[in-house]
Amino acid sequence: MTVRIEDKSAERVVGVRVVGPYPQTIPQGCQRLMAWQQQHQVPLGKWLVLYWDDPAEVAPERLRADVVFTVADDFVLPTSGSEGFALQTLPAGQYAIYNVRVSDGDFERVWGDFYQRELPASGYQPVEGVSYEHYLNDCEADGYFDLDIYQTVKKG
């Protein structure tokens, strides 16, 4: 598992904000977003979770994340039944990408490996911007999580 660096284009996403301990709130956000997606028959893009807080610095009950999926650039949020849902644009830029499999539910270890070992070894450092997970498989059906962790970066 090594870090690769890519220049990414901006991407539009739609989703829902969750606040609280990640292990509880992110699955709830996934269920809510999936129900909304099915109700509105929105084509399902890449499934992502955007993280806005560091669990080492923010109390669990205040942790913020956005459970989202990518949509077309011209997507318009339905006016009915979309309360609590929002459109965002993930910024274009340089990203470090770390591909991992989580089979034991220990996301904290994987993120720690990324920030404490793999990212520093790459010669890049995080910058203020976006960090998120891109889910690459059907996690519930497979029983594990294949994902890419993305972080905006600059050359160290």
From Swiss-Prot:
Belongs to the DNA gyrase inhibitor family. It comes from Serratia proteamaculans (strain 568). Keywords: Cytoplasm, Stress response. The lineage of its organism: Bacteria, Pseudomonadati, Pseudomonadota, Gammaproteobacteria, Enterobacterales. SUPFAM superfamilies: Probable bacterial effector-binding domain. Interacts with DNA gyrase. GO terms for molecular function: DNA topoisomerase type II (double strand cut, ATP-hydrolyzing) inhibitor activity. The gene is sbmC. InterPro entries: AraC_E-bd, DNA_gyrase_inhibitor, DNA_gyrase_inhibitor_GyrI, GyrI-like, Reg_factor_effector_dom_sf. GO terms for cellular component: cytoplasm. This is DNA gyrase inhibitor. Its main location: cytoplasm. Inhibits the supercoiling activity of DNA gyrase. Acts by inhibiting DNA gyrase at an early step, prior to (or at the step of) binding of DNA by the gyrase. It protects cells against toxins that target DNA gyrase, by inhibiting activity of these toxins and reducing the formation of lethal double-strand breaks in the cell. NCBIfam families: PRK10016.1. It is found in: Cytoplasm. The keyword Cell division does not apply. It holds the Pfam family GyrI-like.
